[in-house]
Amino acid sequence: MSTRAHDHRQRGRAGCAGALIGAVFGGAAIAAEPLAMTYDSPNNSLQANKPANGAAPPATAAPADANAEFSPQAAASRFPSERATFALSRETWHSDPEILWPGFLSGMRGFEHFYEPVGNPLYFESPFVNTSLRLLYLGHDFPNDSQLGGGNVNVYAAQIRVALTDRLAFIATKDGWSDLNASALPGAEGWNDFAIGAKYAIIADEASDFVLTGGMRWELSNGDQDILQGDSQELSPFLSFAKGYDRFHILGNVTGRIPTDQDRGNNILSWDLHFDYEIAPETLPGFAPMVEFHGLHYLSDAEHLPLSVGGYDYTNLGSFDVSGSSVIAMGLGFRWKLTPHASVGTTWAFPLTDPDNDIMGNRVTVDFMLSW
């Protein structure tokens, strides 16, 4: 065999080997600037040809482990998210230590640039997994011409969420005290029903800024009936999502409300949409105006109360004649993130459908959230 033919074969083998290495490791730098190889007969070895400018061949780093990028340990090192802004300080209250196991208490990291929803807090469950205490006030007015004859209810409550892992959380979303003043009912005060559950993040994709979470909530019938609580237990499976587009964020939720006693509660389907935009991160860091939409559809009648209005999200009245009716409301407000661990939010909501057909007149919601 001639020396020239031998060199050609060796170059061909080297080229195939280089192509195979590039295919296996996906080296972008190798694909961008192929490295030619020649065979050095005296030394019996392959030699890399230097680029024409005399520079050394470009080095290529080993590819990162895709799973490690989204692990609790990796996410914790980026807490808070580089894209997140805060009004007072981005300093954290702790070093995000690992307690018991990865993800316990710290939950899902890397999504702190999103803004938590405010309106419809009893059923609009956030898709994010974290540990938090949320203090709530709801001032709800009843329509004057509805069957409740006007009036209002003021609700004071707290929600607790505990991250068990970076994907799984325990949630306690309904409790507290209500002061009910409806014209058609005697004034009363008392304890609300208690609701607990769990949620699990099915998808948490930082690269796509997308989270999808499913969960289940169980509402007990322990509340005081004088304030329209304590009538029927309820199971409510839900699915929530979040999608970010730079400073613009969309969150949504779909919830089914299934009474365990079909005679005392209506089957209900509710949904929520939240849109926010961080308008001026340099001059108003951590501040985002928001628009929210809340929908509720009564799917069945019950045999508890002879009414043609339901209980919206406050209660489940088990009304005789509500199947097929719907309520859609719109909320305007904002959330302001003060630090990585504290934020305040408020919305004013009003009905887009005929308010006299249900109990939604208008509502002010205010919250203060502390998170781990």
Q: What do these predicted regions represent?
A:
Residues 1-11:
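N-terminal secretory signal peptides that target proteins for export/translocation
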Residues 32-260, 266-372:
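Transmembrane beta-barrel domains of Gram-negative outer membranes and organellar outer membranes
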Residues 11-17:
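Cleavable N-terminal targeting peptides that direct proteins into the secretory/outer-membrane pathway or into
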Residues 17-27:
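Bacterial N-terminal signal peptides
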